[in-house]
């Protein structure tokens, strides 16, 4: 049995199989994930920033070189900084050569957006693996969920340009759209990451985000351990993601200025407590 309730002043107390998870123990689990982030490194697919005009490419690899240059531009200035002509200048080729690989600005931005999404997912996976696993499966499941949330927020704060680019609006290139339709047709009737009972098409489509899949896997683990009832599993990613993404947006572009990482972590812990308390029982 898994009971969650607030004790005292907004503190979470959890009972797993008769063992009380005290506020101190819960905080210890969350802090383990926070400490794993300290001194962390960029994800394995992180693109090195290039000096303007110094990026080069191997023969036959111009499309990737332009995408890497676009990632460097996005890292510094967000999606508005991703300009095909500037990427060509950094790589050292003519705009005409760049247009042989990308039809225009939107196509390059779409490719950079996918790379930014991958870097976010890499950061989340690295955060989950960095901390020492908890011996108790229930504590480990909660540690993984909180690690995912902390990694998401810290990526947003440390890589604001890439974070904004990862979720910017851009038209999908025609060839990518054709591939997507083919994939959708081949997946009809397949179990989906947002829960096989998901009735929200937009939520089902989010499974293409690796970051979304990582969150889904964390929630699936809660179900496997009996911490989250199966009937509450469908679409559970949506409120969890919305809360953490909303906090990241408020910290980056909104009126919420907490000043330092300790205050940011405290605010995120409050959000994660709310998510856990709303999901498990």
Regions inferred by a protein language model and the residue ranges of each:
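C-terminal peripheral helix-coil segments that are non-catalytic and often amphipathic
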Residues: 1-50, 209-213, 217-225, 249, ...
């Amino acid at each position: 049995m898994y009971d969650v309730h607030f004790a005292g002043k907004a503190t979470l107390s959890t009972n797993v199989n008769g063992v009380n998870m005290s506020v101190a123990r819960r905080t210890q689990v969350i802090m383990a994930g926070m400490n794993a982030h300290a001194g962390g490194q960029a994800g394995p697919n992180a693109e090195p920033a290039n000096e303007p005009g110094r990026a080069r490419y191997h023969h036959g690899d111009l499309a990737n070189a332009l995408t890497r240059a676009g990632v460097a531009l996005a890292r510094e200035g967000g999606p508005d900084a991703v300009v095909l002509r500037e990427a060509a200048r950094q790589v050292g080729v003519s705009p005409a050569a760049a247009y042989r690989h990308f039809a225009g600005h939107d196509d390059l931005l779409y490719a950079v957006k996918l790379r930014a999404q991958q870097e976010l997912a890499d950061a989340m996976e690295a955060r989950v693996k960095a901390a020492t696993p908890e011996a108790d499966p229930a504590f480990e499941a909660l540690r993984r969920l909180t690690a995912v949330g902390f990694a998401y927020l810290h990526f947003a704060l440390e890589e604001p340009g890439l974070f904004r680019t990862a979720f910017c609006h851009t038209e999908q290139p025609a060839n990518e759209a054709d591939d997507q339709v083919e994939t959708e047709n081949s997946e009809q009737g397949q179990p989906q990451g947002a829960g096989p009972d998901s009735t929200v098409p937009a939520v089902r489509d989010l499974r293409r985000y690796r970051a979304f899949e990582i969150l889904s896997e964390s929630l699936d683990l809660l179900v496997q351990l009996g911490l989250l009832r199966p009937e509450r599993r469908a679409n559970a990613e949506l409120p969890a993601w919305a809360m953490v993404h909303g906090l990241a947006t408020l910290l980056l572009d909104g009126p919420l200025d907490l000043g330092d990482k300790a205050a940011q972590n405290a605010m995120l812990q409050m959000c994660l407590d709310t998510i856990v308390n709303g999901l498990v029982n």
